[in-house]
Design a protein with these regions (language model features):
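Secondary-structure transition/turn motif
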Residues: 11, 44-47, 164-165
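Catalytic, metal-anchored helix/loop core of enzyme active sites in primary metabolism
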Residues: 39-130
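Hydrophobic helix-and-loop "lid/oligomerization" segment in the mid-to-C-terminal part
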Residues: 26-29
Length: 190
């Protein structure tokens, strides 16, 4: 089953950290097929200003594709909000009615795909911790390696960005920190 994380009520605080990093938070659906392994997931992710999806806002959605022959391509347009959604639903209903009793080519297979365990995927992580940065600095450096501390002007907490590691490695290290308030993935590559 595909894992998902939803954007919660702490969005304002997360936005402050994103701004401090010169990044933007986007709800990102990812699907990657690398060396015979398939990964899919949905989660809020921090994107750099150079990423094509950085500036997608409002009722617009975008699909960013990295193809082996095509290279990078982005498809962009209305897709969120009540009018675009209603239009898509009506179009689907019309297509069903128009094709009643007909065989439509179906390219879907009955074979269930096995997805890569999310714990094996690699990213950087922005981690928010309750407390004072000075009290944790040495310990965090020892446990997580070379991190980038982030000052977002939020009272009583601080943040840091980890080096690239697997999600499983992050989860294991995070167990030693009950003070962790939140983690968000950082998308490094375009």
């Amino acid at each position: 089953e595909m894992q998902r994380s939803l954007v919660g009520s702490e969005m304002c605080i997360r936005d402050r950290y994103a701004k401090a990093l010169g990044m933007n938070i986007k709800l990102l659906a990812e699907c990657k097929h690398v060396d015979g392994t398939l990964y899919a997931g949905v989660a809020p992710v921090l994107l750099h200003a150079e990423h094509p999806l950085y500036s997608v806002n409002g009722v617009f959605n975008a699909v960013f594709v990295k193809g082996n022959m095509l290279g990078d391509a982005m498809f962009y347009g209305s897709g969120a909000g009540k009018l675009p959604t209603a239009s898509a639903v009506v179009a689907d209903i019309v297509a069903v009615v128009q094709n009643q009793g007909r065989d439509i080519m179906n390219f879907w297979s009955e074979e269930k795909l096995t997805l890569e365990d999310r714990s094996k995927t690699s990213k950087k992580f922005l981690v928010r911790i309750l407390g004072n940065e000075d009290a944790f600095k040495e310990r965090i450096g020892n446990d997580f390696g070379e991190v980038r501390f982030v000052e977002a002007g939020v009272n009583g907490e601080f943040g840091f960005v980890t080096p690239v590691m697997t999600e499983g490695e992050y989860e294991e290290k995070a167990k030693a920190y009950p003070e962790i308030l939140h983690m968000i993935r950082v998308q490094e590559e375009v």
